[in-house]
Amino acid sequence: MKKLLFLLLIVAACTPQNDQQKEIKGWEKQAQKVTIIRDNFGVPHIYGKTDADVVFGLMYAQCEDDFNRVEVNYINSMGRMAEVQGESSLFIDLRMQMYIDPVEVKKEYEQSPEWLKRLMDAYADGINYFLYTHPEVKPKLLTRFDPWM
């Protein structure tokens, strides 16, 4: 019985890591399809074979420029500013939660057409890949971005 329990624990411990490795390989594969060229003013020009590739590159470049703003916009739209800024932001959170219901947003994502899901996935993946390639960046709250957010 102890051997079976030990085996189950090993399998359980390995599964998320395999999923994470698969996700990282997916990001790396998509990143290879994107070219970001910054001009003399630092403006990113993003090239990719598909719209999703360009969206992935856009979010990666935006995070390079100002990850803080990307994260704060997400936190605000999710009605979670008080978790970062404290009690003074409770009213802002309550107001946002009146307009945006995470359960409804997840449902809308699931019901979206495939072409739109690819864009939303690329949007989140570009941010997540940025965080993966820049471990020195410490998010205020969100360590993973989902496409429905």
What are these language model-derived features?
Residues K22-M149:
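Flexible, non-catalytic peripheral segments of proteins
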Residues A12-I24:
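Bacterial Sec-dependent signal peptides at the C-terminal "C-region" and cleavage site
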